[in-house]
């Protein structure tokens, strides 16, 4: 059953480029091709092609941001934000979302077939960067015939991509909305990612990445997800959701999941294994750790001359991407002379707030996009 203001049934599309001999040259210097991106679109592109918004997903996300797939249960990962009358109003904007390079939800990644061997790439897949992901998105935007995006928007790793767009292609965007993200990872953020990677690689079923004919490192990937999920929540949200409540049905074993929070983490880990590739987890987290929006330089110096408007959003209880990192982004934008706004939402959900605080985000984003789009709405003209 479709929800109120839903975009309805959505079909995933595929775009393939970088065919030999024109493979994509990655930041590492290696070449990769052909490359396929899975993507979805919502709403309609206007005559001037001026109303396109690119949504950028986080680590475990995909192209399916809103609506439902035929014959499947559950809506897209940001369904509360995309649709008629919502933050990204599909009666006004043309919304695009693609699965990243290195992913496992339809886009080329480690689990894809290597044309040279006719087997999955596994660890023969080259290391990719956030910049490489954005470069692939730029090819998709060109394919769709869009010269300038109204906005690039994303939370967490999606926010990193938004910053990469702002730095790499400032002339191709009117605005950017980085949410709950950072210019670069802190040592603590890198440490959490490394523990997750080690959990996967310590699983005997990982087989140095060559597990595609077998069961795969399910235990290791589940543990990695459990670690990650702890960082997505806050102490307050865990206390409110679980407290120290014991489970009703406990298996007769000394170290079973006695507490509700233990059972919940195991459930999240086991479900994640069903839809995500372990090697993709390794590659994507490494790309996040290596990301530096300003390449070691002061961000405000890199952004000088940029005309895009920026809305930076953070959440008070987010300890994975604490608010000070978002404040650094906003400060750099203002020092560079950009029109930048910083907003901190008082939420108890932790890092997950960027997916859950739809009401607060909708209020901010609706007004911001209306302001950015004001020239076109009032005059009917748009500079590209």
Residue ranges of predicted features:
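Catalytic-loop region of hydrolases
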Residues: 1-55, 69, 382-384
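N-terminal cap/lid subdomain of alpha/beta-hydrolase-fold enzymes
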Residues: 40, 44-114
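Conserved acidic catalytic loop of the alpha/beta-hydrolase fold
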Residues: 118-120, 124, 131-151
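Conserved hydrolase catalytic core segment
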Residues: 148-188
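Alpha/beta-hydrolase-fold enzymes
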Residues: 172, 178-271
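Short alpha-helix in the alpha/beta-hydrolase fold that links the catalytic acid
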Residues: 296-299, 322-332
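Short beta-strand/loop motif that positions the catalytic acidic residue
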Residues: 306, 312-314
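Catalytic active-site module of serine/aspartate enzymes centered on a nucleophile-bearing elbow/loop
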Residues: 334-384
């Amino acid at each position: 059953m479709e929800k109120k203001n839903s975009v309805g049934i959505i079909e995933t599309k595929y775009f393939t480029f970088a065919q030999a001999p024109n493979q994509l040259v990655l930041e590492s210097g290696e070449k990769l091709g052909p490359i396929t991106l899975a993507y979805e679109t919502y709403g309609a592109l206007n005559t001037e092609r001026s109303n396109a918004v690119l949504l950028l997903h986080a680590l475990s996300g995909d192209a399916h941001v809103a609506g439902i797939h035929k014959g499947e249960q559950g809506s897209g990962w940001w369904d509360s934000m995309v649709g008629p009358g919502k933050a990204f109003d599909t009666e006004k904007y043309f919304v695009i979302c693609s699965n990243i390079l290195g992913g496992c939800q339809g886009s080329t990644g480690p689990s894809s077939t290597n044309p040279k061997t006719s087997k999955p790439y596994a660890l023969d897949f080259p290391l990719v960067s956030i910049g490489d992901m954005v470069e692939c998105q730029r090819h998709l935007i060109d394919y769709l015939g869009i010269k300038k995006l109204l906005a690039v928007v994303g939370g967490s790793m999606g926010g990193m991509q938004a910053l990469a767009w702002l730095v790499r292609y400032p002339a191709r965007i009117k605005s950017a909305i980085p949410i709950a993200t950072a210019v670069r990872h802190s040592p603590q953020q890198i440490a959490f990612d490394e523990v997750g990677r080690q959990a996967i690689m310590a699983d005997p079923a990982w087989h140095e990445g060559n597990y595609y004919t077998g069961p795969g490192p399910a235990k290791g990937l589940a543990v990695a997800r459990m670690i990650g999920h702890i960082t997505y929540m806050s102490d307050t949200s865990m206390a409110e959701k679980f407290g120290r409540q014991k489970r009703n049905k406990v298996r007769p074993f000394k170290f079973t999941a006695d507490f509700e929070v233990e059972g919940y983490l195991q459930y999240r880990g086991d479900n994640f294994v069903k839809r995500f590739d372990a090697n993709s987890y390794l590659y994507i987290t490494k790309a996040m750790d290596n990301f530096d929006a300003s390449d070691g330089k002061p961000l405000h110096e890199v952004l000088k001359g940029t005309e895009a408007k920026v809305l930076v959003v953070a959440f008070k209880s987010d300890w994975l991407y604490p608010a000070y990192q978002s404040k650094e982004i906003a400060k750099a934008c203002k020092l560079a002379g950009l029109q930048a706004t910083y907003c901190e939402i008082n939420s108890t959900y932790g890092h997950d707030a960027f997916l859950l605080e739809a009401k607060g985000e909708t209020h901010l984003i609706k007004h911001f996009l209306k302001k950015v789009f004001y020239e076109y709405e009032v005059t009917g003209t748009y500079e590209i």
